[in-house]
């Protein structure tokens, strides 16, 4: 699934098997919507103008797929840092569960997974979150909790609802345009998963880690759009 390089060695577009090359602007009305970091600071999509942004949807109460996405992003971040691109690339996870994913909960999640300071964990007002994800074409909806209900890992209380959502990675170029989209579950089986993150996984999450679906994406594959957008080869961590 790696992208093709020309004779100059400049990385080319990623494989169509990984996702779709697009060229979609993010309107000022969306880019300027107010978001909040886990530190409680205001920000927006437009605040990252000049950087390549890898944006993923998630919720902190997911213990199946979302932690595997987070794990892959952590691996990708290390590879980007090793390539000397830390100032040019930003990784961000934006919740689809803003009612529960407060800045305080995002901080607890950051501590749990060991995310570096340069990785953004974002929330916002529900209407803002809905506008952004609808504009970007990522589907999610609140659904009833199963029976018996799961348990909130932070409070120990029974969960009262869940959020179904599409698993997506969106790559924004330095001008703020969406240039590549990956839709599908992550394959973290070949990546070094932190012990704390592994313990956080539910039984289904551990099964997905051990036996990923054939159509999933790996951290190494998901680096190719970043290499294309920065014009710099990026070697997977540990290679």
List where the protein language model places each region:
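Short, small/polar residue-rich loop motifs at catalytic or cofactor-binding pockets
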Residues: 28-29, 52, 164-166
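N-terminal targeting signals for export/organelle localization
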Residues: 1-36, 219-239
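Structural microenvironment flanking redox-active thiols in thiol-disulfide oxidoreductases
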Residues: 70-132
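Sec/Tat-exported extracytoplasmic proteins
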Residues: 52, 58-59, 77-84, 113-117, ...
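Extracytoplasmic/luminal low-complexity segments enriched in Pro/Gly and acidic/polar residues
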Residues: 190-239
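A short acidic/small-residue loop/turn micro-motif
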Residues: 50, 184-188, 230
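Short active-site neighborhood of thiol/selenol oxidoreductases, capturing the structured segment around
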Residues: 43-73
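Thiol/selenol-based redox catalytic cores and closely related redox-interacting motifs
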Residues: 118-204, 208
């Amino acid at each position: 699934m790696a992208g093709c390089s020309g004779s100059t060695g400049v990385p080319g577009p990623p494989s169509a098997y990984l996702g779709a090359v697009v060229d979609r602007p993010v309107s000022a009305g969306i880019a300027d919507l107010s978001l909040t970091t886990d530190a409680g600071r205001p920000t927006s999509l437009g605040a990252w103008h000049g950087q390549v942004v890898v944006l993923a949807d998630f919720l902190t109460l997911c213990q199946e797929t979302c932690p595997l996405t987070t794990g892959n992003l952590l691996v990708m971040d290390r590879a980007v840092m090793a390539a000397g691109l830390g100032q040019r690339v930003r990784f961000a996870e934006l919740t689809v569960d803003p009612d529960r994913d407060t800045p305080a909960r995002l901080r607890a999640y950051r501590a749990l997974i060991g995310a570096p300071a340069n990785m953004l964990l974002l929330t916002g007002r529900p209407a803002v979150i809905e506008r952004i994800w609808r504009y970007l074409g990522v589907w999610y909806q609140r659904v009833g909790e199963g029976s018996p209900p799961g348990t909130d890992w932070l409070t120990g209380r029974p969960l009262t609802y869940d959020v179904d959502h599409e698993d997506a990675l969106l790559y924004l170029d330095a001008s703020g345009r969406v240039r590549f989209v990956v839709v599908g579950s992550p394959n973290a089986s070949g990546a070094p998963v932190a012990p704390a993150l592994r313990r956080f996984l539910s039984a289904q999450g551990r099964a997905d880690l051990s036996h990923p679906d054939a159509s999933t994406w790996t951290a190494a594959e998901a680096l190719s759009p970043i290499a294309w957008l920065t014009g710099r080869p990026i070697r997977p961590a540990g290679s």
